[in-house]
Amino acid sequence: MARVTVQDAVEKIGNRFDLVLVAARRARQIQSGGKDALVPEENDKVTVIALREIEEGLITNQILDVRERQEQQEQEAAEIQAVTAIAEGRR
């Protein structure tokens, strides 16, 4: 079992409350969103992986926001393509 000291992660994020929010958000992405870990998993739980990513500076709240916006734009573009294909098929 990995031991994680969160002091470095707190320094990267700014305060412990925001750290909890960012780590939880990232852990949910890894667990349910099908996102790959950016650090070796080493049989760690997703919360530990999220904290290690934050500690190494790979994940911040801003990075998560940008990634989510990009994914949303890609999904919207795919939906528009699908609707266009359906509409053209009906002509």
Swiss-Prot record:
InterPro entries linked to this entry: DNA-dir_RNA_pol_omega (IPR003716), Pol_omega/Rpo6/RPB6 (IPR006110), RPB6/omega-like_sf (IPR036161)
Reactions listed under catalytic activity: RNA(n) + a ribonucleoside 5'-triphosphate = RNA(n+1) + diphosphate
Cellular component per GO, a single term: DNA-directed RNA polymerase complex
Entry annotated with the keyword Transferase: yes
GO biological process: DNA-templated transcription
A GO molecular function held by the record: DNA-directed RNA polymerase activity
The enzyme's E.C. designation: 2.7.7.6
One Pfam family linked to the record: RNA_pol_Rpb6
Statement: the UniProt record of this protein carries the keyword Transcription: yes
Coiled coil: none
Keyword annotations of the record: DNA-directed RNA polymerase, Nucleotidyltransferase, Transcription, Transferase
Function, in words: Promotes RNA polymerase assembly. Latches the N- and C-terminal regions of the beta' subunit thereby facilitating its interaction with the beta and alpha subunits.
The protein's assembly and partners: The RNAP catalytic core consists of 2 alpha, 1 beta, 1 beta' and 1 omega subunit. When a sigma factor is associated with the core the holoenzyme is formed, which can initiate transcription.
UniProt family annotation: Belongs to the RNA polymerase subunit omega family.
Protein name, as recorded: DNA-directed RNA polymerase subunit omega
